[in-house]
Amino acid sequence: MRGHSLTYRVKLPLVGALLLAGGATLSNANASAMETESSAPEVERNKQAVGAAFDRWSAGGSNFFSEMLSPDIVWTIEGSGPSAGTFRGIADFTARAIKPFVSRLREPVRPVSKRIWADGEHVIIHWEGEAVARDGKPYRNRYAWIFRMAGGRAIEATAFLDLAPYDDVIRRIPEPSNMGAGDAR
């Protein structure tokens, strides 16, 4: 009988600890599920806001970046080459990434297809864009953008694209001489 008593004394605290740990895990899982449920409307709002902004851009609108990006956006273009890098603030992003490219286009980039997913504070957009360069040659590219959202705007963005066609437009076509340093067209 003494052996059983020792077994119970060892097993009982072990079982109690496991039950407490299991309860804590279930409690954390329930809290996480409740958090997800409470943020579900915001996740859907972010997804719809980005989708609607893309639709307006596709239809000819030109306010996508000012509409969707926080003034303090941190935008990273992944990859290697002269166009890859991190831009801090919408003014930096506009001056160093948007303006040099857009100034070399006859027709602006327009999304021609898109897919959007949202999870938590992130919205992921996979899209294809087309434009015409000033020399009449077409520009086509596929993009994947990952936005981290706050207050209905992107505060961080990570962009994946084929930089070769982008850099080719910048290398092939000179920037117009009438574009002042602050003009972002």
What are these regions (language model features)?
Residues W145-D168:
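Short beta-strand edge/turn micro-motifs at domain boundaries
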Residues R2-V15:
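Bacterial N-terminal signal peptides that target proteins for export
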Residues M68-D72, A118-E121, F147-A154:
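Short, solvent-exposed coil/turn segments at beta-strand boundaries
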Residues S66-A118:
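A solvent-exposed, acidic/Ser-Thr-rich amphipathic alpha-helical stretch
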Residues R106, A131-R140:
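Short, cysteine-centered beta-strand-loop-beta hairpins and adjacent loop/turn segments enriched
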Residues G22-N63, E67, P71, E121, ...:
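Short, low-complexity N-terminal intrinsically disordered segments enriched in polar/charged residues
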Residues P111-I116, E128-A131, R142-F147, T158:
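Hydrophobic/aromatic beta-strand elements that line small-molecule binding cavities or substrate pockets
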Residues P13-G23:
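Gram-negative bacterial Sec-dependent N-terminal signal peptides
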